[in-house]
């Protein structure tokens, strides 16, 4: 690997450690030319599937859009950010485990609803009202019955 200080092409790995989450490797390197040390991180490159929208067009998967869906539904709800991060990670992991090149926006929405049902019932109903385009109060009642029935 090229030294970031002097640009020399040869560096030596001094130490390697697996990160706490096991998803990356931290390496300490030493430049053989200028003798300076630096740290690199090695992670697996994964490709998220393309998202097929309701109208049929395709878009790149957006981590930001996924996170925004969660944060809007959870706005002013007592759910800590680390729990939201874990839920976002679970949805991304499920998408990768599908092993598909394309996934429908509907599938992603259902995964988000499943995670919200675990995190916060009010957020679930908020998300469902937009995602399922509720037209009247009866649809809210149905969603509330659905989520409270799942709890029993």
Swiss-Prot record:
Keywords: ATP-binding, DNA-binding, Metal-binding, Nucleotide-binding, Repressor, Transcription, Transcription regulation, Zinc, Zinc-finger. Residues 49-139 form the ATP-cone domain. Binds 1 zinc ion. It comes from the Bacteria. One of its GO terms (molecular function) is zinc ion binding. A zinc finger (unnamed) spans 3-34. One of its GO terms (biological process) is negative regulation of DNA-templated transcription. The keyword Transcription regulation applies. Belongs to the NrdR family. HAMAP family: NrdR. PANTHER family: TRANSCRIPTIONAL REPRESSOR NRDR. NCBIfam families: transcriptional regulator NrdR. Negatively regulates transcription of bacterial ribonucleotide reductase nrd genes and operons by binding to NrdR-boxes. This is Transcriptional repressor NrdR. It comes from Laribacter hongkongensis (strain HLHK9).
